[in-house]
Amino acid sequence: MKKFLCAFAFAVILSGSAFGASESEMKRMSVFVSNFTEVGMYHIDVDDISDSELAFFGIWHNWHNNFKSRIQRCPNKNCPYGGYIIDKKYVAESIKKYFDTEIDHQSTENPKWGYYDGKRYYHFEGATGEAVQARVTQVRKRGDTIIMRGVTYWPDNDEIEGRPFTATATPYKYNGKNTWAILTLEVED
């Protein structure tokens, strides 16, 4: 029994210490991770992310969460790049808030998902569908890094089994509020 306890304690030290997150903190972490899963970003590594991927996140995060206040119809009749626009400042703001980084504005890999006009707006075609959410069930801390584990889920369909995920983030202040900046997210295939 002593060998088991020693091995368990050693594993905890190697994997990071338990982090006593409250229920409300776990809920905030779940919402934080859901900001990425709801736009279909299941594999994130900030060391390898491109400005195109950041632009994609900034556009679609606002589509899901700030539609009425930040998304507008394209004023150009038969707009060749989609029926909606968003000001680049809102895209940059979302990227700063969730990634704690700046963006060199450019179009996404698929221009229909976000064409940058080189001036002020991203143009894109809207989309519908149910957003995949995340539920954080375990939290650990390793140095300044928070490790969140959990499962994805579909809010309107409990019968579909979600996929496990691991996310890492670093705490920081955004506009005077405590939050996190994503470092990695890996949703199992």
Which sequence ranges carry the predicted segments?
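Exposed beta-sheet edge and beta->alpha loop/turn motif
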Residues: 124-189
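Generic structural microfeature
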Residues: 15, 90, 164-166
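Core segments of small alpha/beta cavity-forming domains
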Residues: 21-122
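Intrinsically disordered regions, especially transient/low-confidence alpha-helical propensity segments
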Residues: 10, 57-60, 110, 151, ...
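Feature targets compositionally biased, intrinsically disordered low-complexity regions
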Residues: 15, 19, 39, 57, ...
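Positively charged n-region of N-terminal signal peptides that target proteins for export
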Residues: 1-4
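Hydrophobic helical h-region of N-terminal Sec-dependent signal peptides
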Residues: 6-14, 18
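Extended, non-catalytic scaffold segments that flank or surround catalytic motifs
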Residues: 16-18, 23-39, 43, 136, ...
